[in-house]
Protein backbone atom coordinates (compact mmCIF):
# COMPACT_ATOMS: atom_id res chain seq x y z
CA UNK A 1 0.00 0.00 0.00
CA UNK A 2 1.19 3.52 -0.81
CA UNK A 3 0.97 6.22 1.88
CA UNK A 4 1.99 9.87 1.56
CA UNK A 5 2.80 12.00 4.61
CA UNK A 6 2.74 15.77 4.11
CA UNK A 7 5.32 16.72 6.74
CA UNK A 8 6.08 20.32 5.82
CA UNK A 9 5.93 23.04 3.22
CA UNK A 10 2.34 22.59 2.21
CA UNK A 11 1.05 25.89 3.63
CA UNK A 12 4.11 28.06 3.07
CA UNK A 13 7.32 28.53 1.14
CA UNK A 14 9.86 26.57 3.15
CA UNK A 15 10.19 23.48 5.33
CA UNK A 16 9.43 21.26 2.33
CA UNK A 17 9.27 17.62 3.36
CA UNK A 18 7.21 14.67 2.12
CA UNK A 19 7.46 11.02 3.09
CA UNK A 20 6.29 8.36 0.66
CA UNK A 21 5.79 4.93 2.21
CA UNK A 22 5.39 1.74 0.20
CA UNK A 23 4.44 -1.21 2.38
CA UNK A 24 7.03 -1.11 5.19
CA UNK A 25 9.65 1.10 3.51
CA UNK A 26 9.72 4.83 2.91
CA UNK A 27 11.69 7.66 1.33
CA UNK A 28 11.78 11.27 2.42
CA UNK A 29 11.61 13.85 -0.36
CA UNK A 30 13.19 17.13 0.70
CA UNK A 31 14.16 18.38 4.12
CA UNK A 32 14.10 22.15 3.83
CA UNK A 33 14.24 25.23 6.02
CA UNK A 34 11.84 28.14 6.30
CA UNK A 35 14.40 30.87 5.64
CA UNK A 36 12.59 33.74 7.39
CA UNK A 37 11.96 31.71 10.56
CA UNK A 38 15.52 30.35 10.55
CA UNK A 39 16.97 33.87 10.33
CA UNK A 40 14.67 35.12 13.10
CA UNK A 41 15.77 32.24 15.33
CA UNK A 42 19.49 32.61 14.71
CA UNK A 43 20.01 36.36 14.20
CA UNK A 44 20.03 37.50 17.83
CA UNK A 45 22.33 34.87 19.27
CA UNK A 46 25.67 33.28 18.67
CA UNK A 47 24.57 29.68 18.59
CA UNK A 48 27.26 27.11 19.20
CA UNK A 49 25.03 24.12 18.51
CA UNK A 50 21.62 24.46 16.93
CA UNK A 51 19.17 22.01 18.50
CA UNK A 52 16.74 20.40 16.04
CA UNK A 53 13.90 20.55 18.57
CA UNK A 54 14.40 24.31 18.94
CA UNK A 55 14.40 24.77 15.16
CA UNK A 56 11.10 22.86 15.00
CA UNK A 57 9.62 25.10 17.74
CA UNK A 58 10.79 28.18 15.82
CA UNK A 59 9.04 26.93 12.68
CA UNK A 60 12.37 26.85 10.85
CA UNK A 61 12.47 23.14 9.92
CA UNK A 62 9.84 20.43 9.30
CA UNK A 63 8.33 18.78 12.35
CA UNK A 64 9.79 15.33 11.78
CA UNK A 65 8.57 14.24 15.21
CA UNK A 66 5.19 13.92 13.48
CA UNK A 67 6.62 10.90 11.63
CA UNK A 68 8.64 9.43 14.51
CA UNK A 69 6.90 6.07 14.06
CA UNK A 70 8.36 5.85 10.53
CA UNK A 71 11.95 6.68 11.51
CA UNK A 72 13.27 3.15 11.01
CA UNK A 73 11.33 2.69 7.75
CA UNK A 74 12.96 5.60 5.92
CA UNK A 75 15.56 4.19 3.53
CA UNK A 76 16.65 7.40 1.77
CA UNK A 77 16.49 11.18 2.01
CA UNK A 78 16.17 12.67 -1.45
CA UNK A 79 16.46 16.45 -1.82
CA UNK A 80 14.76 17.19 -5.14
CA UNK A 81 16.98 20.18 -5.87
CA UNK A 82 19.53 22.50 -4.27
CA UNK A 83 17.29 25.28 -2.90
CA UNK A 84 17.48 25.77 0.87
CA UNK A 85 13.73 25.30 1.27
CA UNK A 86 14.33 21.75 -0.02
CA UNK A 87 17.68 20.75 1.54
CA UNK A 88 18.55 23.34 4.19
CA UNK A 89 17.35 21.23 7.14
CA UNK A 90 19.44 18.19 6.21
CA UNK A 91 22.41 19.34 8.34
CA UNK A 92 20.14 19.53 11.40
CA UNK A 93 17.74 16.61 10.96
CA UNK A 94 19.22 13.87 8.77
CA UNK A 95 21.25 12.23 11.56
CA UNK A 96 17.94 11.19 13.11
CA UNK A 97 17.53 8.70 10.25
CA UNK A 98 19.65 5.72 9.19
CA UNK A 99 19.22 6.67 5.55
CA UNK A 100 21.48 7.65 2.70
CA UNK A 101 21.10 11.09 1.15
CA UNK A 102 20.67 10.77 -2.61
CA UNK A 103 20.74 13.61 -5.13
CA UNK A 104 22.11 14.95 -8.37
CA UNK A 105 25.71 16.15 -8.58
CA UNK A 106 24.74 19.81 -8.19
CA UNK A 107 22.44 19.14 -5.24
CA UNK A 108 24.94 16.99 -3.36
CA UNK A 109 27.77 19.48 -3.97
CA UNK A 110 25.66 22.33 -2.57
CA UNK A 111 24.90 20.16 0.48
CA UNK A 112 28.57 19.27 0.93
CA UNK A 113 29.50 22.97 0.72
CA UNK A 114 26.97 23.84 3.44
CA UNK A 115 28.26 21.04 5.66
CA UNK A 116 31.88 22.10 5.16
CA UNK A 117 31.12 25.78 5.73
CA UNK A 118 29.19 25.07 8.93
CA UNK A 119 31.63 22.34 10.06
CA UNK A 120 28.84 19.77 10.34
CA UNK A 121 29.49 16.02 10.16
CA UNK A 122 26.67 13.73 9.09
CA UNK A 123 26.37 10.03 9.81
CA UNK A 124 24.47 9.62 6.53
CA UNK A 125 26.25 8.63 3.33
CA UNK A 126 25.79 11.12 0.50
CA UNK A 127 25.27 9.43 -2.87
CA UNK A 128 25.39 11.27 -6.16
CA UNK A 129 23.31 10.19 -9.15
CA UNK A 130 23.55 11.34 -12.73
CA UNK A 131 20.65 13.44 -13.94
CA UNK A 132 17.92 11.38 -15.64
CA UNK A 133 19.16 8.14 -14.07
CA UNK A 134 17.27 5.69 -11.89
CA UNK A 135 18.31 4.00 -8.67
CA UNK A 136 16.80 1.10 -6.75
CA UNK A 137 16.80 2.02 -3.06
CA UNK A 138 15.22 -1.14 -1.67
CA UNK A 139 13.00 -4.07 -2.62
CA UNK A 140 9.88 -1.91 -2.73
CA UNK A 141 11.28 1.45 -3.76
Language-model features and meaning:
Residues 3-8, 12-24, 133-141:
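Catalytic core of the metallo-beta-lactamase
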Residues 4, 20, 30, 81-82:
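Divalent metal-coordination and catalytic microenvironments
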Residues 7-9, 31-32, 105, 131:
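Fold-independent oxyanion-binding glycine-rich loops
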Residues 13-14, 84-87, 110, 135:
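Active-site environment of divalent metal-dependent phosphoester hydrolases
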Residues 25-78, 92, 99, 103, ...:
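Pre-active-site segment of Zn-dependent metallo-hydrolases
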Residues 76, 80-86:
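Histidine-centered divalent metal-coordination motifs
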Residues 124-131:
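Short acidic-hydrophobic, aromatic-tinged amphipathic segments that line or gate anion-handling sites
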Amino acid sequence: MLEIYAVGGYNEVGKNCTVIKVDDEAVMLDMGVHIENYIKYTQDEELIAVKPSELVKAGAVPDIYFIEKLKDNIKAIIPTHAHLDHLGAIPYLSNKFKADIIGTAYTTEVLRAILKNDKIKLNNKIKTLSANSSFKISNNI
